[in-house]
Regions:
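Catalytic-site neighborhood detector that most strongly recognizes the C-terminal catalytic loop/helix
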Residues: 309, 314-334
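Conserved tyrosine-mediated DNA breakage-rejoining catalytic core shared by Y-recombinases
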Residues: 188, 193, 197-230
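Flexible interdomain linker/hinge and immediately adjacent N-terminus
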Residues: 120-168, 213, 252-257
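Basic, Lys/Arg- and aromatic-enriched nucleic-acid-binding interface segment
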Residues: 159-192, 218, 243
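N-terminal core-binding DNA-recognition domain of tyrosine recombinases/integrases
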Residues: 32-48, 56-144
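Active-site/catalytic core of tyrosine-dependent DNA strand-transfer enzymes
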Residues: 226-279
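C-terminal secondary-structure termini that scaffold catalytic or DNA-interacting sites
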Residues: 3, 335-348
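C-terminal catalytic core of tyrosine-transesterase DNA break-rejoin enzymes
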Residues: 183, 288-312, 319
Length: 348
């Protein structure tokens, strides 16, 4: 028995277009799709909904290998269900990343709780703990902690691209469309999905402003750098095909000419130029990190950077603030040179 994810067109506004079904019969996996419907009604972003669907598809395939069905019965759930699922993923070859394992376990946990609210906790009790909640007035009453069934995620130290790397990578592009995309990531800090979701009316060149739909469909307005304004203007006047679509960035050639540029197309574009220039770390998210680091070097405040990047929590912004060892050395040298405290000298 095999399962896969399909996208269906439905007039029902309360039904998710993404469905997990049996491959041979097309029968839906009810408990999974009911959870997807709930998240769809909550207006979960399309990319997040797709991630949930494929995470649950992986769980269903694992469950079917043990129980010979994709349907989950409340009596089959035990306190070690998700722990067993986590162990299965950890033993997989090639290994899954820690963040992938954690995301899949978390989604399966929520979907099972949604379907069986009175069933035994599918997370082992040993992973539950009480903690004292810290509030504005100090420590409050004990509360049950969230599930600690998580694989430790190694801390990544993403070093921003150097000026030379950015220049070499950018010199490989030939169209204003591609340069405008790079400019929006490097000078505005946009995510890949934010760039691809831009429409023509989101660009206000006369006011040098850009309207961006971020995660959770949250809107924010960003100032446009003069270089980005020039590239966008050139692309819209001279390169963009005269098509009826509202999309800003469209395919420029081939059968898909005039249709909205896809994530696969964007990845292919960056992959090609990485191979051409030898800049192996040049990817959309690395440009976003470079944007944050450049603004920090320029003296921007963290609250302002948080607004520009579309973060809801400043702790998320702090993870993007990475400076190079050369920056640390230069700032240290500058600080030491400004010291007025005399240093002890050896006695003669």
């Amino acid at each position: 028995m095999r399962f896969h994810v399909i996208r269906s067109q439905t007039p029902n506004p309360a039904q998710s277009p993404l469905r997990v079904v049996e491959h041979e019969t097309g029968r839906e996996v009810g408990w999974v799709n009911r959870y997807l419907d709930r998240e769809y009604v909550r207006r979960l972003a399309d990319a997040s909904l797709r991630s949930c669907a494929y995470s649950l598809l992986h769980f269903v395939r694992w469950w079917e290998s043990l129980h010979h069905t994709g349907d989950v019965v409340e009596g089959d759930l035990t306190e070690s269900t998700l722990l067993d699922y986590e162990k299965f993923q950890c033993s997989h070859q090639p290994p899954f990343s820690s963040s992938t394992i954690n995301d899949r376990v978390a989604v399966a946990d929520r979907a099972l709780r949604n379907e069986f609210p009175d069933a035994p906790d599918p997370t082992a009790r040993g992973f539950q703990q009480a903690f004292l909640r810290r509030g504005p007035l100090g420590l409050g009453r004990p509360r049950v902690g969230m599930s600690r069934l998580r694989v430790r995620v190694p801390k990544r130290n993403l070093v921003p691209l150097s000026v030379e790397e950015v220049a070499r990578f950018g010199s490989s592009f030939r169209t204003a469309r591609d340069l405008a995309i790079v400019g929006l990531m490097l000078l505005e800090g946009l995510r890949s999905a934010e760039v691809l979701s831009l429409n023509e009316d989101d660009v206000l060149l006369s006011e040098a402003q850009l309207r961006v739909r971020g995660k959770g469909n949250k809107l924010r307005f960003l100032p446009l750098a003069p270089e980005t304004v020039q590239l966008l203007d050139h692309y819209r006047r001279l390169e963009r095909p005269p098509v009826g679509t509202a999309a800003l960035f469209v395919s420029l050639k081939g059968p898909a000419r005039g249709t909205r540029m896809t994530l696969a197309g964007l990845r292919s574009l960056f992959r090609y130029h990485r191979q051409r220039t030898g800049i192996k770390l040049a990817n959309p998210h690395r440009f976003r990190h470079t944007f944050a680091s450049d603004l920090v070097r320029g003296g921007i405040s963290l609250p302002a950077l948080m607004q520009l990047m579309g973060h809801a929590d400043i702790q998320t912004t702090l993870r993007y603030v990475q400076i190079t060892p050369q920056d640390v050395y230069q700032q240290y040298t500058r600080a030491v040179a400004q010291q007025v405290r005399p240093l002890p000298r050896p006695s003669s």
